[in-house]
From Swiss-Prot:
This is Ribosome biogenesis protein YTM1. The keyword Nucleus applies. It comes from Chaetomium thermophilum (strain DSM 1495 / CBS 144.50 / IMI 039719). GO terms for molecular function: ribonucleoprotein complex binding. Component of the NOP7 complex, which is required for maturation of the 25S and 5.8S ribosomal RNAs and formation of the 60S ribosome. The keyword Nucleus applies. The gene is YTM1.
Length: 495
């Protein structure tokens, strides 16, 4: 009697894919773009195929894959099933370099809410401005610095290990007399801050031994009649932009010699007694703005320099508008009217054009991407959705033109990849594309308390400021901490 035959193994299901990319240096030859792959393959397996010797032979570049504008986050078979497609369907996979997931690194403790944060490194704007002006002023590895501003009215300089190197003096010694709302490095030895005392202040920063430093006020700038809630700087020209609750955009010089005299009626001694004038132990030069333009009908919430043309600025306001401003003439060049109050603004450079793409954070929990060119056919290019409260801070990636991070009152920072976009649904207005976050950064202070669920509105853990540097993502907020998240190895759980 013949032995029973064993069942033959079932054939492995396969799917035909076509690999495409928009990155010329990673393009496959035409003959290698179509391939049959296992239906149960995921992102990691596809990435290994592309890195193999017979394909790109790139070794270890981690890739993500877009199908119809959305990242593949399952097996190809599961994607086909969830979209009602058969295994006979040919899938076009656009491969892109993966973003590195941000991993919690550390927190820097403060006495009060952290309103602003900035980073000084070899690749940060201030670091590049410093090295361009003087090669000996270049920031060396291990000498990076973090700047924080707090509602206690103080600035602090930290090293990368979380030790305070310098603290600004109090109001009676030349510092701010109310909460600070914004602060940035101008260069490696100079910085600017602004706040609820309606002033902009310029500081000289010195270090003697890399362990201790000093912040000395060198200039007080007067002109705004409301809280100064936003600040941007250009270290090359030593110019400062501000946005204020008084609806005005301010344009200032950080150089005492080139700044005009201030309006005497706005100086702190204009309406106080002689006895009170004598309370400050420090005498600091006082100057006015190069330009102060009341161009908004509601509080101005943001003002930024054009990343390529520093004679152009963009401003945002609770009056729903983004305005393009010619800083040489003080004239508004164009006005874009959106549908919600705007609370933050950032610019992403674009290849092939001198005009940036603007990201505007709104009170309606989303981010609107807009083209500021007056000739643009549509105002809104894309909408980034995912936050559950106001979006009050934005920072572009230091390494590419397609990603940014946002900070929100919902208690999170979210990382966005503009290469991933889907059509808007009817409920979303059916206009333009929609992108969703690729990573969500929670406040570690909330998680460390053993809380299983963060309040949807972010009560107790609101984020007020975020900046993205090659060192990592630094954010500050209501939990009285600067939180540091760094990128490490690419996520591998999707193998």
């Amino acid at each position: 009697m013949d032995a029973p035959m064993e069942d033959a193994p079932a054939p492995v299901a396969q799917v035909k894919v076509i690999f495409t990319t928009t990155e010329p240096d990673l393009e496959l030859p035409e003959s290698k773009r179509q391939l049959l792959v296992p239906a149960d393959i995921r992102r990691y397996g596809l990435s290994r195929i592309l890195n193999s010797e017979s394909m790109l032979d790139t070794g270890s570049i981690p890739f993500d894959f877009l199908i119809n504008g959305s990242f593949l986050r399952s097996s190809l078979e599961d994607y086909l099933t969830s979209n009602g497609l058969s295994l006979e369907t040919t899938l076009t996979l656009q491969y892109v370099r993966s973003l590195i997931p941000p991993v919690y690194e550390a927190s820097f403790e403060h006495d009060d809410w952290v309103s602003a944060v900035d980073v000084l490194s070899a690749t940060s704007p201030a670091g590049r401005w410093s090295s361009a002006a003087n090669s000996s002023a270049a920031v060396q590895p291990g000498q990076e610095r973090v700047l924080s501003a707090s509602y206690d009215g103080l600035l602090r300089i930290w090293n990368a290990s979380g030790s305070v190197i310098a603290t600004s003096p109090s109001g009676s010694h030349g510092g701010h007399t109310a909460s600070i709302k914004a602060a940035k490095f101008l260069t490696s030895d100079r910085l600017a801050s602004a706040g609820m005392d309606r002033t902009v202040r310029v500081w000289k920063y010195t270090e003697s031994d890399h362990f201790t430093g000093e912040l000395k006020p060198t200039l007080e700038l007067y002109g705004h009649t409301g809280s100064v809630d936003w600040l941007d700087v250009d270290g090359h020209s030593k110019h400062i932009l501000t946005a204020s609750a008084d609806g005005a955009i301010g344009f200032w010089s950080a150089s005492k010699a080139s700044a005009p005299e201030p309006d005497a009626s706005l100086l702190p001694g204009a309406h106080v007694s002689k006895r009170r004038k004598a309370t400050s132990s420090v005498s600091t030069a006082q100057r006015g703005p190069l330009g102060l333009w009341s161009i908004h009908t509601a509080p101005a919430t943001a003002a930024i320099f054009d990343p390529r043309d520093r004679t152009v600025a963009y401003s945002a306001s609770q009056d729903h508008t983004v305005r393009t401003l010619d800083l040489t003439t003080g004239q508004v060049v164009s006005t874009l009217t959106l549908t919600h109050p705007l609370l933050s603004l950032s610019a992403l450079t674009r290849a092939g054009t001198t005009s940036p793409l603007l990201a505007a954070g709104t009170s309606a929990r989303h981010i609107t991407m807009v083209d500021p060119r007056a000739s643009s056919a549509t105002t809104s290019v894309m909408t980034l959705r995912g936050h559950a409260n106001k979006v009050v801070s934005l920072s572009p990636s230091p390494e590419n033109e397609y990603s940014l991070v946002s900070g929100s009152h919902d208690g999170t920072c979210r990382v966005w990849d503009l290469r991933s976009v889907r059509p808007a649904t009817k409920e979303e207005g059916s206009l333009g594309g929609v992108s969703e976050p690729v990573y969500v950064i929670e406040r570690e202070s909330w998680a460390s308390k053993g809380k299983k669920k963060r309040p949807v509105a972010g009560d107790g853990c609101k984020v007020f400021s975020v900046v993205w540097d090659k060192l990592g993502i630094f954010s500050g907020g209501e939990d009285k901490k600067v939180q540091v998240n760094r990128g490490r190895n690419i996520v591998t759980e999707q193998k």
